[in-house]
Design a protein with these regions (language model features):
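Bacterial N-terminal signal peptides that target proteins for export
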Residues: 1-8
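Secretory-pathway extracellular proteins and peptide precursors enriched for disulfide-bonded cysteines
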Residues: 9-11, 144-145
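C-terminal motif of bacterial Sec signal peptides marking the signal peptidase cleavage site
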Residues: 14-17
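Noncatalytic, solvent-exposed loop/strand surfaces
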Residues: 19-23, 31, 42, 55, ...
Length: 408
């Protein structure tokens, strides 16, 4: 199959939301420019990469950029990150570069309606013409939260961290801004001019916003926006993983689901929640605080949720308790739907797992597992349905998931 995989591999400075002794450092307060590359070469069968860091952001585009859309992390709610007729990654050249932005970028750029949109940790949102790089609009959504106001963390300040999402049907950009004095606002912006359509608080009920971090990419399904939360770098305070959803027009009551753990269990993978063709929502859960190996605490797991956020099913590896003790959790990378009703997931331990989406299998109930990454998997993965390009710490690694679910 001809095509290009786009995999976001987060550097060690960007993946510390679930606390690792070997992962540290936050970005500087000054922001990077945006660079956009294009090519006139034909499509290639090799895998391409797109990396976002505090130093640089690059988006690969086709020769007709006005027609390109990349609506969220991995392009769509299934996070596949696969472009069937994309450019040759080996023949890219820089087309334009923006002026310096006002803060660090942790989320992927999104592309829709001839615009490239990015959001910074200073709560600024910028839109550029995708063909020329000319600024289209810029809006600031409020003062961000300084590191000094938080018990722990490694982003200073914290504003917009998770990748936004676009509803192409209404040309609306959705993102979450962390604003003073300590509140997460879901903001809906007009893609054409940056005007605010509406904004509402989406802090998980009963949890302290100053201990929750909105790092995961936003998701749209079932006419709702889904927002996931984990903890700060250092795992301080009484945080728990959570999901909150709101209707696309901001109306009605929010729906929510909180990981049923005593503490922790963050949903911190930058790739965010994944949605399958059934409409079910899949989440990967990081370490939870358990002291009893015989009492599963819903940490180091993949959960299947209905669109109304009712929990249906869960899976965890047989060594879930050991993974928690070694801070080698699954939360570092999100679930990835494959063809045939399967789910691929990996984590800090570098092991890849294939699950049955319709029956996750409980503890140790995966269809297959294999060592995939040296140094762990972080960020996100991409797939054409069977070949999976995993965002490993040392660089993208491609594996094949066979008809028997085995990984090779």
């Amino acid at each position: 199959m001809r095509g290009v995989w786009v995999v976001m591999v987060m550097s060690s400075a960007l993946v510390a939301a679930c606390s690792s002794a070997t992962v540290s450092a936050g970005p500087s307060s000054s922001g990077p420019p945006i660079a956009v590359s294009t090519t006139t070469a034909p499509s290639a069968t090799s895998a391409g990469t797109s990396s976002t860091s505090a130093a640089n952001t690059t988006t690969s585009l086709s020769t007709t950029p006005a027609d390109v859309s990349w609506l969220t992390f991995g392009s769509s709610a299934d996070r596949r990150g696969f472009v069937a007729s994309g450019p040759n990654p080996g023949a890219l050249s820089q087309k334009w570069i923006s002026d310096e932005l006002d803060g660090a970028l942790y989320g992927e750029p999104i592309v829709s309606g001839g615009r490239v949109v990015v959001a910074t940790e200073h709560n600024s949102v910028y839109a550029f013409d995708v063909a020329t790089g000319r600024p289209a609009w810029h809006v600031n959504l409020g003062d961000p939260i300084p590191r000094s106001a938080l018990e722990c963390g490694n982003i200073d300040p914290t504003g917009v961290t998770g990748t936004p999402v676009v509803d192409a049907g209404t040309d609306t950009v959705y993102l979450v801004a962390f604003v003073q004095p300590g509140r997460h606002d879901l903001v809906a912006l007009n893609l054409s001019d940056g005007s605010v359509r509406w904004r509402r608080s989406v802090d998980p009920p009963g949890l302290d916003p100053l201990h929750e971090q909105q790092r995961a990419a936003l998701t749209i399904t079932n006419e709702r926006v889904y927002v996931a939360y984990g903890g700060l770098f250092g795992d301080c305070g009484p945080y728990k993983g959570a999901v909150v959803s709101l209707a696309l027009d901001g109306s009605g009551d929010p729906q929510s689901w909180i990981v049923p753990a005593t503490r922790e269990g963050g949903l911190w993978a930058p790739s965010g929640l994944a949605v399958t063709s059934t409409g079910d929502v899949f989440v990967s859960i990081g370490n939870a605080e358990s002291t009893d190996p015989n009492n599963f605490d819903d940490g180091n797991a993949v959960a299947r949720l209905r669109p109304d956020l009712s929990a249906v099913d869960v899976w965890a590896p047989a060594d879930w308790y050991s993974l928690s003790g070694r801070d080698a959790d699954l939360g570092s990378i999100g679930p990835l739907p494959l063809d045939g009703g399967r789910i691929f997931v990996a984590g800090k331990n570098g092991v890849g797992y294939v699950l049955d989406a319709a029956h996750l299998g409980g503890i140790g109930g995966e269809l297959a597992n294999a060592d995939v990454c040296d140094g762990g998997a972080f960020g996100g993965s991409a797939t054409d349905g069977s070949i999976v390009v995993v965002g490993c710490r040392g660089g993208p690694v491609g594996v094949q998931v066979g008809a028997d679910a085995k990984i090779s």
